[in-house]
Amino acid sequence: MRRRLLGMVAAALACVVLLPAVARAQSAIVGVVKDTSGAVLPGVTVEAASDALIEKTRSVVSDGNGQYRIVDLRPGSYSVTFSLEGFQSFKRDALDLPAQFTMTINADMKVGSLEETLTVTGDAPTVDVQTAVHTSVLNREAIDAIPTGRTIQGMGQLIVGVSLNLPDTGGARAMQQTYMSTHGMTTANNTVMIDGMIVNGLQSDGAVQSYFNDAMNQEVSYQTSGIGAETSSGGVRLNMIPREGGNRWNGDFKSAYRPHQWQGSNLSDAYVKQGLKTGNGIDRIVDATLAQGGPIMKDRLWFFASARYFSVNNFIADTQFKDGSRGVDDQFIRSALARLTWQISSKWKLGAYQDEIDKYRGHDMQSKYEPETAAIQWFSPAYHTNQAKLTGTLTPRLLVEGGFSSNLEYYTNSYRPDVEKPRGTAEWYATTNQTEADLGGWRRAAQGQNTQSPARYNWQASASYVTGSHNIKTGVQYQRGTFYHTVDANGDLYQVYRSASTGIPYSVADSVVIRNTPLAKYGERLNYDVGIFLQDTFTMKRLTVSGGIRYEWLNSQVEGTSSPAGRFVPARTFAAVKNVPNWHNAAPRLSAVYDLFGNSKTALKYSLNRYNQARTTGIASAYNPFQSQTQSLAWTDLNGDGIAQGGLNFNADGTRQPACVYRTAGCEIDFSTLPANFGIASPNQYGAYPRTWNLEQGIEIQHELIPRLSVTGSWFKGAFHNLTRTLNQSWLYEGADPRQNPNYTPTTVYNVLTGAPITVYARTAAAQALPTRNLDTIDPNRKRTYNAFNMEFRARLGKGAQLFGGFAFERQLDVNCTAADNPNTLLMCDDTKNDVPFSKQFKVAGNYPLPYGIQFSGSFQTSAGPNGTPGTITSTQYMAITRGSTRYPANCPSPCPAGSVILPSTFQPATLSVPLIAPSAYFIQRINQLDLKLQKNFQFGRISFSPQLEVFNINNSDAMISVVTNNILSSSYRYANSIMQPRMIGVGAQLKW
């Protein structure tokens, strides 16, 4: 099957490259040509000219309806000239064409001499009356002017409707992954492209991205809905339009410096009373970028190159080195990239790009970690992205393209020096991680170390036939990749303490989490992810309809390999596991745009699209028997030495038995609840479930209020299908009422917030001892819906000034009430009954030139805290109960038995979490952030120098970013673990030539 499919893909690639061409998912100029009587004019030569085009001009001829369409235009300033024998030439000048925008330019031609030219200079249209795709574009002026962290995510948080899992203040989070989401789609459903070529990473099903040097971008577009058949996923579709160099030597140097001495403090007395000794902060941020472009051969071969050094050293809240100094997460990135653009002939163009990124991180840690021992050190992580694309304009109507791109990310997360100990030695047993679950913190060691090596390769080709009224596209994309890992840990476990009762960290031993380490090199393979699409966009008077179909094949597998024995697992050898998954699905797309008044100023848009869930190797990883597995077991520190003692013996056939009797000398770990197949099989079985998909529809109206100012109102709804559920077949009950499951017995606990009784279910000892046989399968009763309402505006104010922003109201509701294997999951399972509010956000950003060469820019955003971001996994507020020891608080409302033990010592499992507040109904605090920037431009001939002053979080918001615990019984419940970066002041400069 795989060989046959690859043959089909190769044939499709060849056919597409040899067939008529494609629009490169960039911009277009379209319109209708008429004479002064209103009659349409066929045969008019329409020429678009711009310095942004290496070939200088692109021309087409209007069709029998007087319509024309010029596609695959780079963003830039254009002039459009209309010529026909017997008529005066007509020219529209100074048209600023943004990325991913279809600009309508109509022409009325007068009878006269061809040598006569009527030139009209006016404001470019701001409403796209041809496409239903919702697009927001940041041009180079906005990228340089608006204060951000200069990452694709940091810039993305300016876009209405886009949410980040963590806010980025002044680039303080630019060294680590932050994740964008929109319209209820997971972060893996984002598509990241350079010049229309996919450069997503492979890790986390494509959610993890490289660290792109923003100097390479001419513009960056963010599309969030109405995406056509040329793209698989329905999340944020991000396209970086590259700088190409040009016919004139040009370059720039940008620098920024933000030291901790210039940062304020937002650590309030309330946080200090909670035990937060220090807030978040920066040690320093340093950013220096050099870029140079120009011609190697004028009009034939251009180059662009850039080098960047970017360092962010963050203070970690409530973390100190042994000498008393604040804990610092020290890290830097070095980037070197180059791009070549070659106009091979009048019809063919080749572009190629390579970016090498090296990343270092000295102390990967969180609040209350012991920096010298518990931090993770990233050794020589290396990221490589590249891309090459050949495009051909065979005739004004026939265009082709084909290319290759890849994303390789290799990194090692290791213990700090001298923490790793030789396996099996006394030090190895003694130097395990200690985790304080109630009060927060790690010490003695990290929980483990690992290497990760994801690699993703992409080939794609496409073609289109373009007339004035039609744009027929067809194309194919083929991706493959591998993801290899290793994992190891001192002691093959970490120790968990819950010390809320004493208030003294690491004083109450609770449990151990054992691991199936060591894991030698193991991995998963994306055999193929293939998509073939066909789409036609056609215009009938004021109506433009786009219909398309996309068909996709996706196949992954687990690689076969071996690993040696560990403390809790025998030596293991597993064969490859194939077809996890093996999917083939259609994804139809439909949209319509109506030019309401025929003046290109008001557009009514509708879209109805199916988006398949993005996957790479995530499913294969879930069924890899070598996946990193953990199991929580009860631990009693009998001798009080802080070292968890005990192990397992293995027979020749791989079966096991405890090496000693629990609660005797040297035997402190209770293995009675350890599943029989721990570490020797994947805990989950693949149920061959179908691919999850989302049916999204949107209605939007866009109107140009006055020249250069447009407003947009929109509504979007998503309905997710083929959602899955994990069922442990050992505890499965087929009866109608899961509360009658014979593997469970009911017992009553009390809500510590209200005193109301709650029925929970104890697993029988016989059921608890059964092996874990998790089956992942489709759940026909599980539902997820998403609704959003947006109001946006965008203003081009002249002289480079711009302002954009708006409101977004969004809500996601989940119904997940299938409880055939565990009736405890019925609690808080239906969001339609959980009073989930709409999450609200407002954003505004822009830049404005002032007299004397001064430019003012800034952004303001207010949004729900991280736990209120739709489309992300949020945390339920719960009671964490350990059997036989956890007690009701003294102030528990009646009829709650205050002070009593909540669960008996015989309860199974050993710990139980009882949700009291639904995750989607809980918000931490609103994040309100105001960032401003002032710069002064000094011009010296062709050289300009602009010193700048930046201030981030001017309002000095102290909103919580994370909490110590969501366990309502903990004394640290909802206490701040980290807070917003306080007010941050920085200086910088831009030198351009």
What are these regions (language model features)?
Residues 250, 280-360, 378-406, 588:
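Transmembrane beta-barrel wall of Gram-negative outer-membrane proteins
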Residues 667-672, 759, 853-942, 946, ...:
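Extracytoplasmic gating/loop element in the C-terminal half of outer-membrane beta-barrel translocons
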Residues 922-924, 959-993:
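C-terminal beta-signal and terminal closure region of outer-membrane beta-barrel proteins
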Residues 165, 559-587, 591-777, 890, ...:
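Solvent-exposed loop/turn elements at secondary-structure boundaries
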Residues 2-6, 10, 15-139:
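Periplasm-facing N-terminal accessory domains of Gram-negative outer-membrane beta-barrel systems
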